[in-house]
């Protein structure tokens, strides 16, 4: 798709925005360092975004927003002892907010750290660290690539969390 962008003093700039298929049911489009991703039914969000990082070839990104409808969700929080407490949300629910980041682990594999808020069909809100989440209908996610950043996930002593190191 070609898009005409008018900028004062009305110099014409043409930006080419093309959709890119990835996997079986995910597509994305790119404009500069911004990616907009559509993940379809049945795909797990972490796995899809990790595949995207490998396909596009970036090492660091901010996941700025996400919405959709999901199911089979495992989420939770870290308690005062550094242990994650996990909760299951089996029924389909609205993904009302998603944010986080994408970095690389020490072995080079992509790692996603995501926090979310979901609303069930009774409008009860569930929120926390997302361990697993399958798309029920669709998820739409915005990602900003941090092309000059180096972010590495490293084990931290005495907690389940992989810490974020900048180098």
What is each model feature region?
Residues 10-112, 117-167:
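N-terminal intrinsically disordered, cationic/polar leader segments
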Residues 4-6:
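Leucine-biased recognition of intrinsically disordered, low-complexity hydrophobic segments
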